[in-house]
Amino acid sequence: MSPAKVDVTKKSDAKAQALKTAKAVKSGTTKFKKVKKIRTSVTFHRPRTLTKDRNPKYPRISATPRNKLDQYQILKYPLTTESAMKKIEDNNTLVFIVDIRANKKKIKDAVKKMYDIQTKKVNTLIRPDGTKKAYVRLTPDYDALDVANKIGII
C-alpha cells in the first residue's frame, strides 16, 4: 500500500509545481526577462571590445632594419651638362640625379649633411629615362659656383 501512496503524492507535487510555474509565466515575474533593444539603423556596428597591450615573449624581428635611404644613397651624382652649368652660374642652383624614392625634404637634408650648405628650395622631376633630377637652389649666403668647385663639378 505504501508505494501507491508515494506515487499519488509525487503526482500531486508535480501538478502543484506545474501550476505554480504556469502562474509565474503568465504573470511575468521571471528573473531573466530579456529586454529587446530597439534598432534604429539598418547597419550593424560591431561594439568596441577590450584590447590588451601586446606583451610578446620574444621579438619577432631579430635586428632592426637599417635605413636604406641615407644621404649617400639619395644623392647619386651631380649633373655636369651645359644647362646644369648655366643654372649654377645664373640661378645659384646645383643639379643632382637622385634616388627615385627620395622626396624633397630628404634631398634637402642629404645636401645639408654632405656639403654643409643651406638650401632655399628643391625642385624635382622624373626624367624620361626613369631617373629623378633635383634642382637644389642655395640660399644667397652660399655661392653655387664655389660649392660646385668644392664638390669637383667644375
UniProtKB/Swiss-Prot annotation:
InterPro entries: Nucleotide-bd_a/b_plait_sf, Ribosomal_uL23, Ribosomal_uL23-like, Ribosomal_uL23/eL15/eS24_sf, Ribosomal_uL23_CS, Ribosomal_uL23_N. One of its GO terms (cellular component) is ribonucleoprotein complex. The keyword Membrane does not apply. This is Large ribosomal subunit protein uL23. Keywords: Ribonucleoprotein, Ribosomal protein, RNA-binding, rRNA-binding. This protein binds to a specific region on the 26S rRNA. It comes from the Eukaryota. GO terms for molecular function: mRNA binding; rRNA binding; structural constituent of ribosome. One of its GO terms (biological process) is translation. HAMAP family: Ribosomal_uL23_A (MF_01369_A). Belongs to the universal ribosomal protein uL23 family. Pfam families: Ribosomal_L23, Ribosomal_L23eN.
